[in-house]
Every structure is written in C-alpha cells, then in structure tokens.
C-alpha cells in the first residue's frame, strides 16, 4: 500500500516504507484500543483508494470520500462528511478516520466531528500532531510552523503532493472535537493524536 501514493520524488520514496510500517502498527493497535472484531460494522471516513481495507481486507468496512474511488475494494459512498452523510444515526458500530481531519477546513471541523459521532456508536480518529517537527505530508522540517507565504515556497522542496491547504491540529483542538486524545510517540515527541471511543462504550 502506497502511503505517499499521491506524492512524488525522492522524499516520498524514502518515507513510504517507514510510513507504511507505522500505519501497520496503528492498524494492529486499532483492535486493541477499540475492541473491534471482524463482525464490527465500520465506516472509513475519508477512505482514499484503500484506507482501512488496504491492511484489513476482511473487515466489514464501508468507505466514504469526497471524490469517486473506482478501485475501492468494497462498498463505497461518495459524500462530504462535513455535511449530512446518507446514513441513519448509529448506522455503524465504529467510525474510522486516519489522517483526514487536518484536510478539513477549520471552520468545517466541528461539522465533520458531529457527523462522525452521529453515524457511529464509537470511533477511532487519528491525525498528525502539529507539535511534531516534521510535516508529514510535505516531509519537510518545520514546514507547518511557517506563515502561509514562506510555507508555500518551502513546500516546493518537499514531496510534491498538493498539501498546501493542510492545517495540523494541536491536542486541545483534537480533544474539543473527539474527546480525550492518546499520544503516538517517536521517542519523546508526539507524532500523532488518536481519539478512541471503544465499541460498546456507554452501553448497558
């Protein structure tokens, strides 16, 4: 699975196997953290071309994304998760979203979070941490800490994806949307935030 499939250049080629291993570890932890099983009905919000199915193809996963994904290997719904998704309340046992919310315009993030919480009884949401010094899309040090003008110019030196409108989140922002956040670390540094409401939480 190409983690940096939409980027090009030597930085992407170097980073791809590293990121793929990190994502594999995250997916393995998904089951421990959420209590999900093969019978769990999962909505992958912002699924991309493979998403969760790329590493766990036997799960009961429905994908949804802003653009058509004709190669997506399972049920797929074209929809904008900042608007009302075409699902009933609590239609899924678990909503899964990995490295998506940072792509959502800040003014639409509350709506995005509300839809994730509406359509599923539990959730697993991961997003890169703004405090980590390497911007994970451009693969450049400090790129996300620069003002917009210098950032756009600097971005051209990195992985050549269309990442300019990404805005990474801090812990308070993430927790305001999805509740308590866990820290995924690289050494002493927080690389990602993960918010989890386990399957079955709050049920009698």
Regions found by a protein language model. Name each.
Residues 122-149:
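Conserved class I S-adenosyl-L-methionine
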Residues 18-28, 108, 166-173:
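Soluble or luminal CAZymes and related metallo-dependent hydrolases
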Residues 12-16, 154-164:
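Short glycine/proline- and acidic residue-enriched helix-loop micro-motifs
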Residues 28-32, 114, 172, 176:
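Surface-exposed alpha-helical segments enriched in charged/polar residues
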Residues 160-180:
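Short alpha-helix
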Residues 31-132, 197:
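Conserved SAM-binding loop
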Residues 1-35:
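Class I SAM-dependent methyltransferase Rossmann-like catalytic core
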């Amino acid at each position: 699975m190409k983690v940096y499939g939409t980027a090009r250049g030597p930085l992407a080629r170097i980073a791809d196997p590293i990121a793929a291993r990190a994502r594999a570890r995250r997916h393995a932890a998904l089951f421990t953290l959420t209590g999900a099983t093969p019978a769990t009905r999962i909505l992958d919000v912002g699924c991309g071309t493979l998403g969760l199915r790329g590493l766990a193809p036997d799960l009961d996963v429905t994908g949804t994304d802003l653009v058509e994904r004709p190669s997506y290997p399972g049920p797929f719904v074209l929809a904008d998760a900042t608007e009302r998704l075409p699902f009933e309340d609590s239609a899924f046992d678990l909503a899964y979203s990995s490295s998506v919310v940072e792509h959502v315009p800040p003014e639409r993030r509350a709506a995005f979070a509300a839809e994730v919480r509406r359509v599923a009884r539990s959730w697993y949401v991961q997003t890169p941490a703004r405090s980590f010094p390497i911007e994970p899309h451009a693969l450049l040090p400090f790129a996300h800490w620069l003002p917009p003008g210098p950032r756009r110019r600097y971005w051209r030196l990195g992985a050549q994806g269309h990442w300019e409108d990404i805005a990474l989140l801090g812990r308070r922002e993430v927790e305001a949307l999805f509740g308590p956040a866990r820290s995924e670390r690289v050494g002493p540094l927080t690389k990602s935030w993960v918010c989890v409401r386990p399957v079955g939480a709050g049920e009698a």
